[in-house]
């Protein structure tokens, strides 16, 4: 067990850091400091916390309501325990929290390939499905990409192809200590939103989808504190990405500040569709959808992928004084060219071939 340490506050000195003091702070409805949150996660990631303490922490934090400082402390701890990817931070991630239970096709995964094919390097961080039929890792496997690669292999993929995938269990092995308590309590907690904040490549830009309406501004706040350029989004139909069935809420993170607005896809020439037109299936079904998309199939799925790819491109480039709609319109043209030129299909084939070779040589 780590030795307890005292925490100074404006009102005096808090009790030494122990689980009773941290849990007592939360159950009293008071916020943790960045360092206190980091201490708690360090204990969890070091296997120094019991299942009861982990479960109590997740539930108490959820009931109080998480702050950007708390999420930042937890995420910083996770990154401190993670395996590092040796790439510079001039990359973008396109990722969602999951948990929207919509069972749509893998929009963010397809968008990641489109963005990478446009020449912007992508490091995607993801996992297998938790509440859906197909997660990002599942569909990439079905597309022929080997996902169990280590840091050096992922970095090589980024250098040679322009995209890499960090499979969460490989890069955050210590998170397994929280697995059983999370499963036992059976409700979403802060652990469900940490994935998009803990990409081991530490990208400077991102399109981050958040399925939980009460946490979207908190996630945006963490990214602002880090100085990232990002769009943090939630479809007003509940999707953890930009939707084409209705409007989306968009938190624009730039220069350490957050601005919030609504986006209607019709304002950039994308028709609204029924959410049913974006539904998918298991990994094999969704992989077939991706292959048809990259072969030139048009329709609602293409529109949704282009919209999210455009948003990631806008987050990477920055708005630069443009309106969100203007930045997205520029990104749409770039994304469409990635598909129509065959670049996205070619990139996928090259990536699958490279990862197969790397996996064989491990």
From Swiss-Prot:
Known catalytic reactions: N-(5-phospho-beta-D-ribosyl)anthranilate + diphosphate = 5-phospho-alpha-D-ribose 1-diphosphate + anthranilate
InterPro entries: Anthranilate_Pribosyl_Tfrase, Glycosyl_Trfase_fam3, Glycosyl_Trfase_fam3_N_dom, Glycosyl_Trfase_fam3_N_dom_sf, Nuc_phospho_transferase
Annotated binding of Mg(2+) 2, by residue: 240-241
One GO MF term: anthranilate phosphoribosyltransferase activity
Entry keywords, A to Z: Amino-acid biosynthesis, Aromatic amino acid biosynthesis, Glycosyltransferase, Magnesium, Metal-binding, Transferase, Tryptophan biosynthesis
Binding-site list for 5-phospho-alpha-D-ribose 1-diphosphate: 96, 99-100, 104, 106-109, 124-132, 136
Pathway: Amino-acid biosynthesis; L-tryptophan biosynthesis; L-tryptophan from chorismate: step 2/5
Binding positions for anthranilate 2 per the UniProt entry: 182
UniProt feature coiled coil, ranges: none
GO terms classed as biological process: L-tryptophan biosynthetic process
EC number: 2.4.2.18
Amino-acid positions noted as binding anthranilate 1 in the UniProt annotation, renumbered to this chain: 96, 127
Pfam families on file: Glycos_trans_3N, Glycos_transf_3
Residues binding Mg(2+) 1, per UniProt: 108, 241
Cofactor(s) essential for the protein: Mg(2+)
Keyword Chloroplast among record annotations: no
Keyword Hydrolase attached: no
Record note on cofactor: Binds 2 magnesium ions per monomer.
Gene Ontology terms: cellular component: cytosol
Role: Catalyzes the transfer of the phosphoribosyl group of 5-phosphorylribose-1-pyrophosphate (PRPP) to anthranilate to yield N-(5'-phosphoribosyl)-anthranilate (PRA).
Family to which this protein belongs: Belongs to the anthranilate phosphoribosyltransferase family.
Record note on quaternary structure: Homodimer.
Name recorded for this polypeptide: Anthranilate phosphoribosyltransferase
Source organism of the structure: Rhodococcus jostii (strain RHA1)
């Amino acid at each position: 067990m780590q030795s307890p340490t005292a925490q100074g506050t404006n009102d005096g000195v808090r009790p030494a850091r122990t689980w009773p003091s941290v849990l007592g702070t939360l159950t009293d409805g008071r916020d943790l400091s960045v360092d206190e949150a980091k201490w708690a996660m360090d204990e969890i990631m070091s296997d120094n916390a019991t299942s009861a303490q982990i479960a109590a922490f997740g539930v108490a934090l959820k009931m109080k309501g998480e702050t950007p400082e708390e999420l930042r402390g937890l995420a910083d701890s996770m990154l401190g325990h993670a395996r590092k990817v040796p790439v510079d931070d001039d990359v973008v991630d396109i990722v969602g929290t999951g948990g929207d239970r919509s069972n749509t096709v893998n929009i963010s995964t397809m968008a990641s390939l489109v963005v990478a094919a446009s020449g912007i390097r992508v490091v995607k961080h993801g996992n297998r499905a938790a509440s859906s039929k197909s997660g990002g890792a599942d569909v990439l496997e079905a597309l022929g990409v080997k996902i169990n690669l280590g840091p050096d292999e992922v970095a090589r993929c980024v250098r040679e192809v322009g995209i890499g995938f960090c499979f969460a269990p490989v890069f955050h092995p210590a998170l397994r200590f929280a697995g059983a308590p999370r499963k036992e309590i059976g409700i979403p907690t802060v652990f469900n939103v940490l994935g998009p904040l803990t990409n081991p490549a530490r990208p400077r830009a991102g399109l981050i989808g958040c399925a939980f309406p009460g946490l979207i501004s908190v996630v945006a706040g963490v990214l602002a504190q880090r100085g990232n350029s990002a769009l943090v989004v939630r479809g007003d139909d509940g999707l953890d990405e930009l939707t084409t069935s209705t409007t989306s809420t968009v938190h624009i993170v730039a220069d350490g500040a957050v601005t919030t607005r609504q986006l209607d896809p019709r304002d950039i020439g994308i028709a609204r569709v029924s959410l049913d037109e974006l539904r998918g299936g298991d990994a094999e079904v969704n992989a077939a959808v991706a292959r048809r998309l990259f072969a030139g199939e048009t329709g609602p799925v293409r529109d949704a992928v282009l919209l999210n790819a455009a948003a990631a491109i806008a987050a990477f480039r920055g708005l630069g004084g443009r309106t969100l709609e203007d930045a997205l319109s520029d990104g749409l043209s770039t994304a469409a060219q990635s598909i129509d030129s065959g670049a996205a299909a070619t990139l996928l084939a090259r990536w699958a071939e490279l990862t197969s070779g790397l996996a064989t040589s491990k």
